[in-house]
Amino acid sequence: MADPRKTVPPGNGGEVTIGEAFAWLERMVEAINREAVNHLPRELIFQVWQRSWRYWHDDLGMSQSYTKYRYLRLMQYAMFIHVKKGCTCLGGGHGPGGWRPGPPPPPPGLV
């Protein structure tokens, strides 16, 4: 009988190719962005992407896929914190406009 420590568990035999991993990363980035726009300000999402690209890709010279992976991790953490802090929109999202309720009412006397 073969040593069980030297056998590869089912599903982990290297069947996933690099191309499939990159495709998975693309799908996850798109999915997190679709969900994040319902919970976080678009400006924040855009700034996280820009700063991730500048820091990991431009400054450190990391690959595009690594930069996307780091962005994905940051956005997952941001969404986790948002929900942990008491997001009440777990079912349907905050709606268009993200987390902002809209402009404040005008001051009294100016209506």
From Swiss-Prot:
Name of one Pfam family that matches: VPR
InterPro entries recorded: Lentiviral_Vpx_assoc_factor, RetroV_VpR/X
Top-rank lineage group of the source organism: Viruses
Subcellular location: Virion; Host nucleus
Keywords, sorted A to Z: AIDS, Host nucleus, Host-virus interaction, Inhibition of host innate immune response by virus, Viral immunoevasion, Virion
Single Gene Ontology BP annotation: symbiont-mediated suppression of host innate immune response
Region (Binds to human NUP153) residue spans: 61-80
Record motif Nuclear localization signal, residues: 65-72
GO CC terms in record: host cell nucleus; virion component
Function of the molecule: Plays a role in nuclear translocation of the viral pre-integration complex (PIC), thus is required for the virus to infect non-dividing cells. Targets specific host proteins for degradation by the 26S proteasome. Acts by associating with the cellular CUL4A-DDB1 E3 ligase complex through direct interaction with host VPRPB/DCAF-1. This change in the E3 ligase substrate specificity results in the degradation of host SAMHD1. In turn, SAMHD1 depletion allows viral replication in host myeloid cells by preventing SAMHD1-mediated hydrolysis of intracellular dNTPs necessary for reverse transcription.
Quaternary state and interactors: Interacts with the P6 region of unprocessed GAG. Interacts with host VPRBP/DCAF1, leading to change substrate specificity of the CUL4A-DDB1 E3 ligase complex. Interacts with host NUP153.
The family this protein is said to belong to: Belongs to the lentivirus VPX protein family.
Name of this protein: Protein Vpx
Organism: Human immunodeficiency virus type 2 subtype A (isolate KR)
